[in-house]
Amino acid sequence: MASYALQRLLLMIPTFIGVTLIGFFIMRLAPGDPAELRAAGGLGGATGAGISVEKRMAVDEAMAQWRAQYGLDRPLHVQYGIWMKNLVTLEFGESFKDNQPVWSKIVERLPVTIKLNALSILLVYLIAIPLGIYSATHPDTWSDQALTLFAFVLFAVPLVWAATMAIVFICGGDFLYLFPPGGLESLDYSQRWPFWRKMKDQAWHLFLPVVLMSYDGFAGLSRYMRASMLEVLGQDYVRVARAKGLTEKVVVLKHVVRNSLIPLVTILAGILPGIIGGSVIIETIFSIPGLGQLGYESVLARDYPTIMALFSVSAVLTLIGILISDLLLSVVDPRIAFGRRE
């Protein structure tokens, strides 16, 4: 197991380089010039037609100096090489938007996004697995059909629409005020509050964003669990266990569920990047100061250093998620022995 984990960690290096290389060139090919945005803000927006020749020359000179300062006037492969060299020392440079160190901005916001994603993944599995077990043990009943219909409806609801409707109807819009419309803390939040009150306030703010980030995940995952269990329930060893007189509860929980979890562990690697992508929408709509909101603002500002830093963090988290899901397979199914050859 240890040797396999080491091999996978080493293979993550070329994978990471390939992912960041593609992301780097796609980002630079996107429309919009950060130098023009910078010059427009610094010179009063005088970048359009109808300004004086002197003003136009001042704008062009400012943009040329700014591009040279950040190396944007160099070939793309040279820019990527410089970026990769700085990445080794975690030197992501300064943000184009506010000249703040990119790494400090990420470190400040990373715990919020990790908390949201961790709670969302936990909620997805806590809801999806019991729903899948119930549907598989009650196939083709009205409750199974209702759960299937409910899951497909949830899976089809766009996250942007669901979050907007939640704010309008239950977050102090025109109807109810059950949850706060944004942020992580109340306006009267104080560090002098007792621990339980701080936890209660944060849970109140996190509940709705976590649920919204999770609903399509547990809707789809519950269907995977149902299909996997139905397949396992038809195996010969399940019939043998029943023939030995074992109760249905023991058969399901001891023999069926564990083998049914193998596909769900594999799917974990695909859920993680999807939830990270969903955090961009949720953090932006609910004004949560996480990496998703930072990424959205950086894209609008063409903040290349911040975008690439966030892209790198997301790539690393995704690769780690894939590795963890592979290692968990050996825990769920002891027959799997990674790195061994017969």
Mark where each language-model region is.
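Hydrophobic alpha-helical membrane-insertion segments
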Residues: 16-24, 152-171, 267-272
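Residue-level signal for discrete positions within transmembrane alpha-helices
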Residues: 12, 109, 113, 149-152, ...
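N-terminal signal-anchor/signal peptide hydrophobic helix marking the start
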Residues: 6-12
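Alpha-helical transmembrane segments of integral membrane proteins
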Residues: 2-3, 110-111, 115, 119-143, ...
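An internal, D/E-rich "acidic patch" concept
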Residues: 67-129
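Residue-level recognition of pore/gate-forming positions within transmembrane alpha-helices
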Residues: 12, 20, 43-44, 125, ...
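Hydrophobic alpha-helical transmembrane segments of membrane transport/permease proteins
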Residues: 16-78, 170, 174-198
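Hydrophobic membrane-targeting alpha-helices
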Residues: 21, 25, 29, 165, ...
